[in-house]
Swiss-Prot record:
Changing P28L: In strain: Isolate BCQ.3994. It comes from Bovine coronavirus (strain Quebec) (BCoV). This is Non-structural protein of 4.9 kDa. It comes from the Viruses. InterPro entries: Corona_NS1. Changing V43F: In strain: Isolate BCQ.571, Isolate BCQ.1523, Isolate BCQ.2590 and Isolate BCQ.7373. Belongs to the coronaviruses ns4.9 protein family. Pfam families: Corona_NS1 (PF06145).
Length: 43
């Protein structure tokens, strides 16, 4: 997980981002992965 990704979650730049429609689709998937990664015990 990168700092920029975290910043994008806290302050989304979807309006200015040229691929905002792509990010709107990808972000929920990435968020789900983060939730899984943070709730599951480290292997």
């Amino acid at each position: 997980m990168t700092t920029k990704f975290v910043f994008d979650l806290l302050a989304p730049d979807d309006i200015l981002h040229p691929f905002n429609h792509v990010k709107l689709i990808i972000r929920p998937i990435e968020v789900e992965h983060i939730i899984i990664a943070t709730t599951m015990p480290a292997v």
